[in-house]
Amino acid sequence: MKDDPGYCGHWPYRNRPKITWPGGARLAFWVAPNIEFYELDPPKNPQRAAWPHPYPAVPGYSIRDYGNRVGHMRQMKLLDKYGIRGSISLSAALCTHHPEIVALCKERDWEFFTHGIYNTRYTYGMSEAQEREAILDSMDTIERAVGRRPAGYLAPALSHSEVTLDLFAELGGLYTCDLFHDDQPTPVTVRGGQRFASVPYSLELNDTIAFVVNKIEPRRYGQMIKDAFDQLYAEGSESGTVMCIPTHNYQVSCPHRMRAFEEALDYITGHPDVWVTTGREIAEHYLATGYDASLADIAARNALALSSTDAKGA
């Protein structure tokens, strides 16, 4: 096991090269609906159980089925209202199990990035060849369904190996959502040397983390979103920032949670200088306009730190 995967070094937030967004926007805002498929009786993984209770896992399966039956339609209608194109973190198996959901999102020109095949099948314990095949299968399945190859990746159930990002970059991916380390896009060093970026994806604003893990009530969640926006919007006056709201159609789309979520979306989209966009568009813009300056700044800072260390040791 590596001590450090080496994807990114320390790069302080202050005094970085300025990031500019289209139209002079301060903040790039995207919503990432996780549209997933969970199996009732999934294959067992030796490192992680898919369900906290014995199989068949009817309660867990059925609430997620509620999300795909009811919650998705509710959330899609709300995003339509505010002119937000979702960036779907998609379990590729959904293309087979619920192709009608994929078709509805495709009609709206939503982005599809890959979230693995099933959200009950994990990377843990896979060989490199097996993981490569799983990622490739998910990319191919989504491309067949929507006509465009996924540019982004979020590991299924956030399960990773040491080479996950290397493999996705080698297979043609442009960005990862698996590094929760910044509020701006950053370069990611991968073994093949591809131009590859991290696009901010917030665990703090993730509805599952908020509601299930941190036990936050809906009104407080809505206020958290507004507070996060205010901070990032203010910082964006100096250099462009990114705000992502990751959602799940069986969480935020429950009836008692929708009003607070809508109020937050209304607040954000009511501000000027907000680029309402997708993960792919953020990655493509950054790779074209900010990536090289970021690499140069990182190299310069590393050289300065090295020379300072050498001077102290002399």
Listing of model-derived features with the role each one plays in the protein:
Residues 185, 199-220, 240:
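Positively charged, amphipathic and often flexible ligand-engagement surfaces
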Residues 1-152, 157-197, 222-245, 251-314:
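Catalytic alpha-helical scaffold of carbohydrate-active enzymes acting on polysaccharides/glycoconjugates
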